[in-house]
Each structure stands twice: as C-alpha cells, then as structure tokens.
C-alpha cells in the first residue's frame, strides 16, 4: 500500500449524494464477500489451508466464526464459478484483508507454501503492519498484524470521493465513525470488529466479473431495507421483491471430476435466502441477502 494514498474506513455503497430520509431503520450487518474462481472446492481448500476460517453455511463458502443457524451469522467468504474473471487489483473492490498475530511469520509461511507475495511487510505511520499477497485466481489479499482482531478483517475499495460520501454510508449501513490506526472512517461491531477501507481512485474498474465480484449485507427485513434505500435514490439491478432461493445450489467440480457440477444443499440448521443486487456509481457491486428462517419468517 502506498504511503501517500489516503485511506478511509467506510461502509460500502456509493450511490448518490447524501439525502436525509424522514424515518430510520435497523442498519443491516455486513454479511459476506464473494470471490470468483474457476473451481470452488480447490479455492475453498486453498483459503482454509493458507488463510484460515472454518466450514461455512454451505460447502462453497468459509465462515469466520461459529455457524449457529441464527442471527448474528458469521462473516463468510463465498466462492462462485467463473471461467473468465479478471484480477481484483485496481477495481472498485481492490482487495480483501485478513489479520494475524505475527505478520512476518505468516508471510514466511505463505512464501514457503508458494503463495505469491506482492508487497513485503511494512509499516507506515500509525497504520497496521501489513503486506499484500495474491491468490492463484487474482484476488488481491492484504495481510495485517492485528492480534486483537484476528481473521476476516476488512475489504479495500477504490472509490471516487470517500470523504464526501461517508455520511451517506453511515446512513445506509450504520457503523461507528472512528480513527482506526490512522485510517478514518467507520467500523462495524455486529460480529466482532470488521472494517471496509477505501482510497480515492477515479479510474477503478467496476467490481463485477473480477476476482472480488461483490460484497454483501444481511438485513433482517429485506423489504424494509430496500424501501428505505429507495428513499436515498438507490437503483437496484435485480428484482426488489425476490422469491426465496432454494437451500441448494450447484457448484463446479474440478478437472479430476471431469468438470461435473455438484449440488450442495444446506444442513437442517441452515437457511434459504432472498437476495437483491445493486451496483454503486463507483462500480461496487452490492448484494443484500435476507436469511429467512433466522429472520423469523
């Protein structure tokens, strides 16, 4: 990370100028980060081995926290099939961050395992000690040393004007404004501490179709959240009143399986979903996902 780039912690969703709604609502918690990969099982195993986490809601995802089948749900990395995704670096969702107790030891471990390290450990000012790596499919990974907040830690966005839209993000997705190790912005406390950082970038490509495709929030009441965001001028890219997705989904098999697609189904304590999508004016693709049974439906 450049020492001259300004960073801000934000709740992601640049859509429009700040608009003050007349009513308030319960801000949805951050839910998941979606990565495009050519083969899901291999990607899941790579992250479990090199980054950490545990079994997620279904076999195509990794959870960072215990899966209980009820709110609050643990943060998850979700893998999706794509044969032509492009690297995430320089896009609206540039990188995903994970925290470790000893960064130097972790970087050495990754190097010994053949993981590509693109920037060695460094520390600038008050910021965390950090390094950058890249997974085999083009996702840029920031590694930080933050012993008090281990695991899935943050995402880094490239947006046009973080300062001008911080208040809008707080309105849309809650969180606490704070100065965090020299990074100004917002932090989430729903599932421990989680951050979304952003740096100014007028040229970032839209995230959709890249290695980090989108980020997601998990509202308890999807309809209420959608209606509230409409008062802020949000334009959605999918049906805003979706049916519940079945609790099973197809994922692709590896070459050793002849490329066959397999059906992964949720366990009895896992949940069907309702999902809507939107893309911000900065090109950040956003998903809103309602876990129906956990929401009491």
Give each language-model segment a name.
Residues 22-25, 28-38, 58, 63-66, 85-157, 179-189, ...:
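Vicinal oxygen chelate
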Residues 169, 201, 243-247:
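Long, low-complexity, intrinsically disordered C-terminal regions of large eukaryotic nuclear proteins involved
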